[in-house]
């Protein structure tokens, strides 16, 4: 299992690398660290696809294609977030943990990892805006304030993640998988699809 320092390094190094090189993954992750990495890549893809949706003057057909990609990447993000929890709970299970009587944490490890992944992307792109020489006056200063807030929030969350894992290992706290159960990618759960007239 990764501690928060290793996790943040994995997020940040990959965020920088993937802006230059598109990664290739060999199938579905079979271990915790691989799940963390692929989950971060799903957020990376989602971030940049959402940017495309906000481009002024984009055609309707382009927005429709982007929306479908956003749904796909978001589903992937959530599936991998849950897989992070599966691997973490399997590791705890080797020691007959978590204990059923331990207080339940309101957020799972995977949900916290997802939030840290998004913060890594926010920090990278905020730093980019600080460094952008074509930006108007005051832009860099405003983004320096944002960056300080983002780093502070990420530090707090990283400490909380380490504490949750340590307390789970000690049997003093537990977490469980909170399934997202997204409905929009399931045709049988979308009335706009199952009530739509059939086309010839």
Region spans (language model):
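Anionic, Ser/Thr-rich low-complexity intrinsically disordered regions
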Residues: 1-200
């Amino acid at each position: 299992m990764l501690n928060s320092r290793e996790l943040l390094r994995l997020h940040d190094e990959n965020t920088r690398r993937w802006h230059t090189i598109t990664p290739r993954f060999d199938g579905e992750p079979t271990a915790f660290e691989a799940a963390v990495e692929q989950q971060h890549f799903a957020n990376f893809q989602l971030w940049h696809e959402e940017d495309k949706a906000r481009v002024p003057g984009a055609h309707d057909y382009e927005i429709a294609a982007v929306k479908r990609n956003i749904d796909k990447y978001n589903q992937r993000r959530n599936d991998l977030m849950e897989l992070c929890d599966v691997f973490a709970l399997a590791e705890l299970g080797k020691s007959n943990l978590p204990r059923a009587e331990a207080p339940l944490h309101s957020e799972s490890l995977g949900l916290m990892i997802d939030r840290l992944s998004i913060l890594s992307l926010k920090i990278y792109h905020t730093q980019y805006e600080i460094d952008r020489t074509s930006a108007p006056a005051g832009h860099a200063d405003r983004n320096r304030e944002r960056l300080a807030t983002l780093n502070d929030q990420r530090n707090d969350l990283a400490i909380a993640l380490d504490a949750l894992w340590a307390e789970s290992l000690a049997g003093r706290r537990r977490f469980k998988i909170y399934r997202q159960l997204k409905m929009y990618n399931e045709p049988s759960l979308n009335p706009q699809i199952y009530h739509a007239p059939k086309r010839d």
